[in-house]
Amino acid sequence: MSKIDFRLEKTFGYTTGACAAAGAYSALYFLKNNEKLNFVEILNLKGDSLIIPIKNIEKRGNTAVSTVEKFAGEDIDITNGMDIKIEVILENWDDGYPKPSNVIIIGGTGVGLITKSGLQIKPGDHAINPKPREMIETNLKSLLKDDEYVTVKISVPTGDEIAKKTLNPKLGIVGGISILGTTGIVRPMSNEAYKESLAPQIDVALANNFENLIFVPGNIGTKHAKILLNAEEDQIIEVSNFWDYMLDKAKEKGVKDIMVFGHAGKIVKLAGGIFDTHSRVADARNEILCAYASLVSQDVEMLQKILQSNTTEDIVEILTEKGILSEVFNKVSKRVVERLSLRWEGINFSCIVIDMKGNILGKSD
């Protein structure tokens, strides 16, 4: 078990789920003890202690509203700095009233509403994931008497606008962000929250009975998969740079058939065994394409140009002029399939590589 004091910590951050748990605890504590806390110490589900600052807290009667500012540490997170408001209403059970839970959690403005099947939460409910719900309940129950219960309402004033820059609209989560986080801790450069938002795409696809999924790096792949492959929105899985993570999830969930489809600049990295395609991890595009071009032509001048090219599009132009474009990218596509099949056994892979305009450069079969 460890303790992280986020009043001092600058490297690690805390999740939206941890914000909600901290805010709920501070609001209930204020109602019970008439004392405003500038910070609270809560436990995550692993038993780690998280000390989280409280930005503001107000009380009116049996209701208190706490505001917690999301902090991502050194991680890149679109939700960093946004306010999360947690309203807690403290009440007593009526005699004879059934008591299913003494912590009721609901979503308010800026928290998304689920509209598609396949996610961890059923359609019609707000996008507050099970682990954050459990963290809130665990921390509040220590403050409650047997005859007391609370309603916890989570709102995000800027959630609707922020959600437009996330995958929530694609997942059928409308009107706001999701409240996420397994451990409550955001680790630098881990992109945990972002990864956690990517994986549910697979659940939605499987819930809609798609057997062949199309994995794309991002918007270019999505756009042209719809045009060239007549693919449906829920069949297309945006991977971003996290091929290893998303393919692990696909295998875990029993996916049997995956087409890798997208722009050459990202897909060629897979042929080199690079499964996190962010440029800060590795950028061997020129070297990989030079190697495959050398299998087709030993023109040293051409190979030198490939190595010195600024963009993948420049290399496409060089290979086109030489008349070997398709031959090179067919080899690249086949190697992508070989690489992925070796690591993720049991999944049938295929691959199509395109340029920015959606022209097919190469296929695995």
From Swiss-Prot:
Pfam families: CbiD
One function term, GO molecular function aspect: cobalt-precorrin-5B C1-methyltransferase activity
InterPro entries (alphabetical): CbiD (IPR002748), CbiD_sf (IPR036074)
E.C. number(s) listed in UniProt: 2.1.1.195
Coiled-coil stretches noted in the UniProt entry, renumbered to this chain: none
GO BP annotations, alphabetical order: anaerobic cobalamin biosynthetic process; methylation
Top-level enzyme category: transferase
Key word S-adenosyl-L-methionine present: yes
Family in the record: Belongs to the CbiD family.
Record HAMAP family: CbiD
Protein name: Cobalt-precorrin-5B C(1)-methyltransferase
Organism: Methanococcus maripaludis (strain C6 / ATCC BAA-1332)
